[in-house]
Regions:
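Conserved cytosolic headpiece of P-type ATPases
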Residues: 1-743, 748-751, 764, 806, ...
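Alpha-helical transmembrane segments of multi-pass integral membrane proteins
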Residues: 79, 758-773
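Short N-terminal signal/transit or membrane-insertion segments
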Residues: 150-151, 781, 810
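Helix-coil boundary and interhelical linker segments in multi-pass alpha-helical membrane proteins
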Residues: 702-710, 776-800
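Generic alpha-helical transmembrane segments
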Residues: 721, 800-817
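Membrane-water interface at loop-to-transmembrane-helix junctions
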Residues: 746-764, 794-804
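A C-terminal functional module that forms or caps the active site or interfaces directly
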Residues: 820
Length: 905
């Protein structure tokens, strides 16, 4: 049943109750049957299960298999050899796997607290009519059919149809987005279509809202999960968190590397066995040959997989989190950092996000502004809080009292000068309220404020230069024109009139007193935009990001705000929730780009809008602060909650929280997100080019019949030499055009924008340098400086070649990290130095030198001692990677410029 369309009698019949409520026995029976008035709690995933899930990634599985094979080979060798080998490869690989798993669990951000926060919003106790008496019970014990008593300050404990009310206003901003409390009624709502937006159901009270004025009674028609709040809770539990663009790309990369590793390992294994069969070693010694071939395959697996990649990405994202926290953006989910960088659509709630969620007088009409402000202030029930320096009470009346304060008319002082001695309360039929005041001389003065059309027709005079002048048709038209001009700007307009009374009376009535009044003036109010939002939206557009307003407020207000901010240029770009309901999902998916303002929407509309943008391939962010924003925030690629005005529900499902509730902070966060994504790409390109060079080196060496690296060499380079520079690339400052580029396409793979080509050619260049260094060591230096040592059996020519290759590859990758400071520009044009990278380079060089120079480390890694000249050769070969890459980047820039290609952020 749509209770808002039914009479009170029909609602009572449907609830099997009456306006006198239930008996205690009836309530108990229903409680046992229907359950508590609570929201269902979602299932929480055990932490051990989350930990185990970290091990099912393809790259992780390959590392585990490599560790197992390496362990088996070590055990077999130790069983048949007098010299026992320490299983360092196994320990190092498994340590990397476990550390990555721990980091993965630690950084995951879950929305498990969302339902708990919804529970907190619900009232703890409520006043209810039981057995004909008003009693206080736990809100969770309320049932359908209970009649609840609502007064100012009460939280509404369940969804209920109002059956009695006296000037009752309910704050529903968190649920509907409506910034002004809703004046409630008992009357049936007339809706021929049968559909009424949540914010327009004025004879209903909803769980999670708050009574701010007046009093009333209501019969409960929905409890627990059968409330509007329950629908939101259900939407939260059903909303699935998809992978972010970076997670998708790393997952794709993982699969590519997995297939690549398996394919190359099979080829290498087959080639090695064929070679062994050809040279006869397979027949002579089958087991050792096969084991040695396995070892080569393990080396290849270790070389192909960038073990430090997951850790580097996590730490670089963490650096971004720290930087954003300094700019008032708290990241609850690491991957949100990079998602911000590719955001194409920002769906923003209006109330409290684009606006201040504070009604403010912004315009007035009348000859005496001070009298106008004072009359409005005194004819209200809001009070002025001296400590806070602002009014407290119903938002509209607070705006009037604050307006008077700005005119230096403090209500606390004025109400002592003009003491209230009588009133006629506001009601929805009259659309006005009246207060009567007495001055020190005993003179009585009446103020009446309300809807302009109602006030004007009761005025026979108007105030002009301090004098009361008889109202004329022309003056009335002038006032109505002023009213229309304000209303057309989506201002909420109130009028006020005064009347001098002969003496104070014991009773005041509409019929006798709200007539023959003197018109004083009009005020126009609105929830004003935040001053910093307009520049922020301009910045968004410059960065290629489209802002979209989604609000529960009225269409006229939404359009006015949106046009003021530059979100839309024409009212046709706005649509209401009711209009949206008439559009099929298929048609809406095709037309979603036509609209940038959605007014009078309900929670399910917000989720539908977000999903429509995402279905078209746009990376979508959703900002908001109310409970009604939570499902759409969770469904968006990135959810942005408000730290000050935001509800706990919204904060708990958001990926990012703005501690200053400042829309402009999003722009800063987008810039940081783009910087971080740039830097992650730099780190990934650096690591993959390095790993490719290792794979190619082993592949070429295997085909040529020599061993260039052992697993320990590759693990050292991947985990020690490469990790520090990769991390410091994450500290790189933003490039100058980072906020001038269009957002990148989320469908672009990890190798888009020439990254695949760059990794390939850079990997090949480093491979050529490494192979050249090996042959210089094994074929040239072995016959010169090391002939005696080799003859004495201290090490072999192959070991010398491996040592030169190890040193050269390590240093080449360190120097190559400097190439990665800009993926496309010249590093010699970067003005700001990255001191972190310099420090990482020096540290990596020192650690690599220690491995070669310290005897016990050199023995463990099976490296030969090198002299100064050989270091010079290795450095010369390694540093050549910088000019070679600079030349290729210069050629690529020239080609892009000629073809007019613009790179995305």
């Amino acid at each position: 049943m749509k209770h808002y369309l039914e009479s009170i009698d029909n609602v009572c019949a449907d609830a099997q109750s009456s306006v006198d409520g239930l008996s205690s026995q009836q309530a108990q029976e229903r409680l046992e049957k229907d359950g508590k008035n609570k929201l269902a709690e979602g299932k929480k995933e055990p932490i051990i299960l989350r930990f185990l899930k970290q091990f099912i990634e393809p790259m992780t599985l390959i590392l585990i298999v490599a560790a197992i094979i390496s362990g088996v080979l070590t055990a077999v060798n130790n069983a048949s050899s007098a010299v026992k080998e320490f299983p360092s490869d196994v320990i190092i690989i498994m340590a990397v796997v476990i550390i990555n798993a721990i980091l993965g669990v630690a950084q995951e951000s879950k929305a498990e607290k969302a339902i708990d926060a919804l529970q907190k919003i619900a009232a703890a106790t409520s006043k209810v009519v039981r057995d004909g008496k008003i009693v206080v019970v736990k809100s969770e014990d309320l049932v359908v059919g209970d009649v609840i008593v609502l007064e100012a300050g009460d939280a509404v404990p369940a969804d209920a149809r109002i059956i009695e009310c006296a000037s009752m206003k309910i704050e529903e901003a968190a649920l509907t987005g409506e910034s002004v409390p809703v004046l409630k009624t008992c009357d049936v709502i007339d809706a021929p279509s049968g559909e009424v937006p949540l914010g327009d159901r004025k004879n209903m009270a909803f769980m999670g809202s708050t009574v701010v004025y007046g009093r009333g009674k209501a019969i409960i028609v929905g409890t627990g999960m059968n409330t509007e709040m329950g629908k939101i809770a259900n939407a939260l539990t059903q909303a699935k968190e998809g992978k972010t663009p970076l997670q998708q790309k790393l997952s794709q990369l993982s699969k590519v590397l997995t297939y690549l590793v398996i394919g190359i390992c099979v080829v290498i294994f087959a080639v090695s066995l064929i070679r062994a069969g050809v040279d006869g070693s397979l027949k002579a010694d089958v087991a050792p040959t096969i084991l040695n071939t396995f070892m080569i395959a393990v080396s290849l697996a270790v070389a192909a997989i960038p073990e430090g990649l997951a850790t580097v990405v996590t730490i670089v994202l963490s650096i971004g989190v720290t930087n954003m926290s300094k700019r008032n953006a708290i990241i609850r989910k690491l991957t949100a950092v990079e998602t911000l960088g590719c955001t194409q659509i920002i769906c923003s709630d209006k109330t409290g996000t684009l606006t201040q969620n504070k009604m403010t007088v912004v315009d007035h009409y009348g000859s005496d502004e001070n009298l106008l402000a004072n009359a409005m202030s005194l004819c209200s029930d809001a009070e002025y809080d001296e400590e806070k320096g602002e009014a407290v009470g119903e938002p509209t009346e607070c705006a009037l009292v604050n307006y008077a304060a700005l005119c230096n008319l403090n209500k606390n002082e004025q109400k002592n000068i003009l003491v209230r001695v009588g009133e006629i309360p506001f009601d929805s039929s009259r659309k006005m309220m009246t207060t009567v005041h007495k001055d020190a001389n005993g003179n009585a003065l009446q103020f009446t404020k309300g809807a302009p059309d109602e006030i004007i027709k009761r005025c026979t005079f108007y105030l002009q230069d301090g004098k009361e002048v008889a109202m004329t048709p022309d003056k009335q038209d002038e006032i109505l024109c002023a009213n229309k001009e304000m209303a057309d700007r989506a201002l909420r307009v109130l009028a006020v009139a005064q009347k001098r009374l002969e003496a104070e009376k014991s009773e005041y009535t509409t019929e006798n007193d709200e007539k023959d009044m003197c018109f004083v003036g009009l005020v126009g109010m609105i929830d004003p935009v935040r001053p910093e939002v307009k520049p922020a939206i301009d910045e968004c557009r410059k960065a290629g990001i489209r802002p979209v307003m989604i609000t529960g407020d009225h269409k006229d207000t939404a359009v006015a705000i949106a046009m003021q901010l530059g979100i839309i240029t024409d009212p046709s770009q706005a649509i209401t929730g009711a209009e949206l309901d008439k559009i099929s999902d298929e048609d809406f998916a095709n037309d979603v780009e036509k609209y940038s303002v959605y007014a009078r929407v309900q929670p399910e509309h917000k989720t539908r809008i977000v999903n429509a943008w995402r279905a078209k391939g746009y990376i979508t962010a959703m900002t908001g602060d109310g409970v009604n924003d939570a499902p759409s925030i969770k469904n968006a690629d990135i959810g942005v909650g408000m730290g000050i005005t935001g509800t706990d529900v919204t904060k708990n499902v958001a990926d990012m929280i703005l501690t200053d509730d400042n829309f402009a902070t999003i722009v800063s966060a987008v810039g940081e997100g783009r910087r971080i994504y740039d830097n992650i790409r730099k780190s990934i390109q650096f690591l993959l080019a390095s790993n490719l060079s290792e794979v190619l080196s082993i592949f070429i060496a295997t085909l040529a019949g020599f061993t260039i690296f052992k697993p320990a060499h590759l693990l050292w380079i991947n985990l020690i030499t490469d990790c520090f520079p990769a991390l410091s690339l994450g500290m790189e400052a933003p490039e100058s055009d980072v906020m001038s580029r269009p957002p990148r396409n989320s469908k672009d793979g990890i190798f888009a924008n020439g990254m695949g080509f760059a990794i390939s050619y850079q990997g090949v260049l480093i491979t050529l340098i490494t192979i050249a260094s090996y042959f210089i060591g094994a074929k040239v230096l072995a016959n010169m400086h090391h002939a005696e040592a080799i003859a004495n059996g201290l090490y072999s020519a192959e070991t010398l070649g491996s040592s030169m290759a190890f040193l050269t590859l390590s240093m080449a990758e360190i120097f190559h990290a400097f190439n990665m400071r800009s993926l496309h520009g010249s590093i010699f044009k970067i003005k700001k130095q990255n001191l972190w990278l310099w420090g990482a380079g020096v540290l990596s060089l020192l650690l690599t030198t220690l491995v070669v120079e310290v005897p016990f480390l050199a023995n463990a890694f099976e490296l030969a001692k090198l002299d100064g000249a050989e270091y010079g050769i290795a450095i010369a070969l390694a540093i050549s990677i910088i000019p070679m890459v600079e030349i290729v980047k210069a050629i690529a820039r020239a080609i892009r410029k000629k073809k007019g290609i613009v790179l995305a952020a």
